[in-house]
Swiss-Prot record:
PANTHER family, sorted: ATP/GTP PHOSPHATASE, ATP_GTP PHOSPHATASE
Keywords of this entry: ATP-binding, Nucleotide-binding
Name listed for the protein in its UniProt record: Uncharacterized protein MJ1542
The keyword Nucleotide-binding appears for this protein: yes
Amino acid sequence: MVKFMKIKSIAAKNLLSFDDFKITFEDGDVVTIFGPNNVGKTNLFRVLKLLRNIINEKISAVDLEIYLHNKNLKAAKIEVDVIFDKSDKEVIAKFLKIFFKINAPDLIRLCNNLKLNIINSIIDYFSAGSYIWECSELRCYRPYFMLRLRSLEEDIEKIKIYLKERELSEITPDLIDHSKVIHELDRNVEIIEVTNDLKNIITSSVNALITIYEKNEKLFFSTLIDGKENITTRIGDGNIENIVEISMKDFTKDIEKYEDCFKRLTMDKNILRAFVVLLALDKLLANKMSIYVKKVLEYSKENPWDKEIIEDLKYIVRFCGFDYRDIYEISDISLNDILLKIYENSLIFYEDYLPNEGKVMIPDYMIVELLAGLKNNSLEKNVKSKILELFKTSTTKDDLYLGILSMPSEKWIPSYLFYLKNNANLKLRKRYMKIKEMFEYIFNSGSLSFDVILANNKPDIVVYSEDIEIPLNMVGLGVKKILEILTLVFGYESKVILLDTPFNQLYPKYQKRFSKILKDTENIDSQVFIILHSPYFINNENIFNTFRFYKPKKSTKYICIGSIIKDLEKTFGTVILDRTTRKILLSDAVILLSSALRDIPLFDLAEYEDIPIDEYNIEVIRPQNTLSFGKYYALLQYTSIPYILMLRSWILYNLYEEIKDGEGKVRYKLLEKGKYHKIVEERLNFFKNRHPFWISKEEFDKVINIYIKTLEAHREKLIELGYIYLSSKEEVVKYCIEPLRKQLEDILRKKLFIFTVPTDFIIEPQDLKNIQIEKDKYIVHNYIGYRKDVLKEFKEFFDYFVKFHNLQ
């Protein structure tokens, strides 16, 4: 059973950084999103907030243009898939009870005769669906809900099994037993005609429903009011090609005519339930899925014994944000209004602090009375009774914060914690205790805790350690942030809480403890979305709801980290999610150093030549061997994290191998045709069926072919010159490496982002004494010299790399 409303997917078309974007979430309660700056992470939250603002009419169609991804395309769409929880269904059930009492008493009577609770039957179908908003130059629709009729789909599957067992392709009238009709009613022509008509209506309607399901593989029901409210166009995906006529008019316009016969028919329970649900949906459509307040009030006067309908109406009115005292000014409330309000009330954005700021759900005079009593210790017993009375009469369903007069927004934490701590509802008091427990866990080394007190007749918070008390406004920002986040995460239930980089001010130790709290989702009664830049929150517990956002060109894309980690662990047979992996995942780009260069202090050298490596989140990784290289390369490739390969030119362009003659003298022999340096051969073999994500396989193969052909052509030239053997490294550099580097360097740098350093790039301390005259050509760092010209080349190369990959 779903504990709370959950967002299952979010889709956005032509909005912000999203071209045609959809992200789907797994069953976990915590969703983690990370990635470089300015790639669209926060835009995901902005899309959810935009939908909320459109629902509550805080934004007009004219203002929407600034949100468009492509300003020339005057169209946009948002679709948010959700699963409802028990409390959401309770609200919908109250609405449906009122609706059917007012608009379909004949259907209720019919269902009662069948011993079928129409509300219970139909509310089961309100389990999941999509909030949809779409806008174009022609028209901007009000957001509506596309209900996924999963239970009805299950009923149809059972009907299909029922038919298969009888070797039938469709429901026939013979499957509906009318013997009871003949036995209990007159056998006149009229009764027989009504019975036959009724059986035909049932079979044709449910058969049409089965056909629609088989065409679509899913069943939907839209709450969009567009003047085309009929059951035929509303069941299914709305595609005209998939429409199958469902004819129920004869039955619905005169239920009384068929009632006596209908209740005496015997049929498969799934066929009966499917037909009744169709009747109910048809009634909803016929009345524009709305309850008209005037009709409800008239019904209440005529049926004073029905106290429930007025209580349900009050609940619905307040749920929709109206004051019941203004009931006569309210014309109607639609099912769409209810469903949209569920969405609006469910979202809590961290930057907003609270979703219903300014709405005082408990009268101010009661607050003043309560606070005055709390100040006077002699009224302790009266105070307790006042608190109980206050919170017993408050609306705890929405868990709105305690609006203390005109309390500024920064005071919401004391107000809300005061509300939880003193609530008559034990469940709410336990939330306060949980917040306090988690706060003390995070600060256990400092023995910190907090309490809610009254200061100047207003709730306030003091933080204390042993005998020292500090007001909340005097503690560090990190402590405040932790209390805010704990209050949001543990102080609410049935919410979708969206936290945008909430941990930036927190010391790493506290981030780590927070991550441990979020690993255990058993005590979290809301779905939590977190945008962050911390490695501590990337863990195996939530890995399948962990996503990396990136923007390869102008549109945001994402990668599910869990799927990648699972594939890599299967491929390499080892644990992938380690400390280095987490650092890579959070980086903007990675530099892979060959083993020969692993000791280069790259970040320190970059400062000498103003190479802007530290302006970006760059990780330098030093693979220990080919397997290690393969693991990190695959991770980078799957996650589309840009990378640089940095190695010595001696490796990439060398066609010679070192040998020793009989006297032990070192010489260099030209390798046979098709033979290269060992590392080059390993990499060529590795890339046989792979290619960097930023270029196509064809383009990559073309570059590799140019590389190999150039090496082979130069090998032939060396043979012609008689350079089969060379006597020194300097000769290998002069006749082999440098000529090849000049030919291939540009294409390898610009296409594959391979940067090579010459053999004399590094000057060891003992050799520095011999180059004092040329010291201005070297940077000396920790007694080792590095060629300045190579670093200047790397700066140009790095600038090109940044621009190519659009690093922000």
